[in-house]
Amino acid sequence: MIQEFQIRVLPEQAANEQSLKQFIGHDKGLDIRTIHALRILKRSIDARQRTIYVNLKVRLYINEMPQDEEFTRTIYNKVDGKPQVIVVGAGPGGLFAALRLIELGLRPVVVERGKNVRDRKIDIARISREHKVAPESNYSFGEGGAGAYSDGKLYTRSKKRGNVNKILNVFCQHGASTSILADAHPHIGTDKLPRVIENMRNTIIECGGEVYFETRMDSLIIEKNKITGIETNTGKTFKGPVILATGHSARDVYRWLYDNGIEMETKGIAVGVRLEHPSMLIDQIQYHNKNGRGKYLPAAEYSFVTQVEGRGVYSFCMCPGGFVVPAASGPHQIVVNGMSPSNRGSKSVSYTHLRAHETPEHL
């Protein structure tokens, strides 16, 4: 028999499965010897009062063991010989587009201007160590996109959210911790993401797709007012329908689109600064404890939003247990970002303080 309950427990109880079973057994009148397995479906922290609680949705397996995995697998069949679609960019948009194409029985050909996620790490290290930015291999360009080496937070403010649960399950299928399925603010971590990204690439290739690195799209091929492929800096052309998943830093792509009369639409922008606080300070404030978060609570985070002179001012990309990193994608730039490793163990907290601005029409 399977039963699900909503419970509210102390952090030390939430951290120990046996303690959870004992609490549930006492609270729900169950013999804990009959609870053969327990899964946490949802997890969030309630820090509004002095006593901190963890809200959980749990699934109990009474006198039986789970017969399924903790996540739902997507079936990816072979697409050798199927019609091909060109995906420009191997960031999250490009990788998930390629996986979706395989689901639909189409063969993705992914073209990425940067390096694979492992080789890219060497160039990123040089930014901090030598203050040198490789224009095609940096925090923005390369396999995994801007998020691969800047946090791995899984969050969206968009109202067009799509099937978020499926996205999380695809991450788990490729090696991410199943904790992201339960956490209110799921986070993979910069140190864990490269392996997940490699596994996604391997799925694409094993199914019959192709992935090309250090191959930059220089122009679209347009025949009879129809996009039929791309030309690249290597001299190689790729034919087929095109998905542009080029991210916000590929300015050359957007200049080419503009110069060739392809319709584009501006987005609003936000301008601000990235800050760091001592992690202990935020833990003390959020958890109402001069000793910080203690053994059983994660690094604390916060968010705020207000109006100043009729414009929104808000926090963004909170990185608890994280820090500021240089993130320029070309020479003569000063750009920073924030990131956290999976354990969020840094002694600092990083976040961005932004003010919304309308995009000028001439841009």
Predicted segment positions?
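Core beta-strand elements of the Rossmann-like FAD/NAD(P) dinucleotide-binding domain
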Residues: 233-241
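Extreme N-terminal leader/targeting segments of oxidoreductases
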Residues: 2-83
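Conserved N-terminal/central alpha/beta ligand/cofactor-binding core
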Residues: 6, 119, 125-210, 215-216, ...
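Glycine-rich FAD pyrophosphate-binding loop
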Residues: 106-124
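N-terminal Rossmann-like FAD-binding beta1-loop-alpha1 element of flavoenzymes
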Residues: 85-110
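A conserved short coil-to-beta-strand element within the FAD-binding core of flavoproteins
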Residues: 213-226
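Conserved small/polar residues in nucleotide/adenosyl-binding loops
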Residues: 352-361
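Glycine-rich loop(s) and the adjacent beta-strand/alpha-helix scaffold that form part
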Residues: 244-291
